[in-house]
Amino acid sequence: MFITDPISDMIVRIKNANQRKFKTVLIPYSNKKAKILEILLNEGYISSFVTKGEGKDKTLEVALKYKGNQSAIIDFKRISKPGLRVYAAANNLSSVLSGYGTVIISTSKGVMTEKQARKENVGGEVLAYIW
């Protein structure tokens, strides 16, 4: 199956698994998705993730995080889409919910949070907001 926007597909899979209270979710592998999941892990939105399989069957198994009966992820939104790319310069990077959430940005130095991009003084494509 061909997916036109793999990052949106990953976000929808995570949101659907959260709504159904699943412990894990499988996502087709890509380097960019692995970097995004690394950010989610460092920011405390997921418990862990591991890479499984090889070649075309390679997947990312994500262990979702819950606090009691409540998901650690309140909402996860895709910002820049294939039909409408959204870019931000280093001095125009905004935060989500006054710093409560996380902005994920793809820069020339890799995928990082808005805070890291400010420290590195780089802008880029705004991939997603999560809180």
Swiss-Prot record:
GO BP annotations, alphabetical order: translation
Ranges annotated as spanning the membrane: none
Keyword RNA-binding: yes
A cellular-component GO term for this protein: ribosome
Pfam family, one: Ribosomal_S8
Keywords of the record: Ribonucleoprotein, Ribosomal protein, RNA-binding, rRNA-binding
Domain of life: Bacteria
Annotated GO MF terms: rRNA binding; structural constituent of ribosome
UniProt record similarity statement: Belongs to the universal ribosomal protein uS8 family.
Quaternary structure note: Part of the 30S ribosomal subunit. Contacts proteins S5 and S12.
Role description: One of the primary rRNA binding proteins, it binds directly to 16S rRNA central domain where it helps coordinate assembly of the platform of the 30S subunit.
Matches recorded under NCBIfam families: PRK00136.1
Protein name: Small ribosomal subunit protein uS8
